[in-house]
């Protein structure tokens, strides 16, 4: 059920009868919130970020950083150095240079802290530990595999990109197993079964076996969008290709 706000007055006496949090926008200067172009909550903040499910937004004022509901009320009494949006009912926060996640009551959900923490995706989150190594944790802050990496990105559809100690990029699953045995100089996430990858010749698209979809290499590429992708040749000419690598049009 969407949380709604009834009878809330704005600074210009505009009354909101019913508000879906998804329709609350951030002002251009990132200091307050707007509904239908008009300010709500009768308050300016030092900084705000947009609302996320289930209708909670990170804000910062002279008391510190915290989260508010769609009535503009703080949802807990704690204050942090910095707060971010809720994902999977967890929000990344910073307190005295320590990064960790809190629940919707503002309480830390695990005992350890990190040098950096991302946002939970698919109930898993990438973090950077005290040795500046990246890994993924579950909702309770537990490592989901034993290895650490030079870098680790978010999971999408159960697959994440990591940079190994060898300096190459690979894909892993949620158990930390490599998706295939092929290493790349750079790597993107899978989108509709294909990922962007860079080898010593250039960029191309690969499948989950790490095999290239075509022989051509490019200076830059984008993920496939409904069967087609924008790529940049080494002469800087941009081209639309299909999933077989066939050049369709110059753009």
Q: Which role does the model predict for each range below?
A:
Residues 2-251:
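Residue-level detector of conserved, function-critical positions
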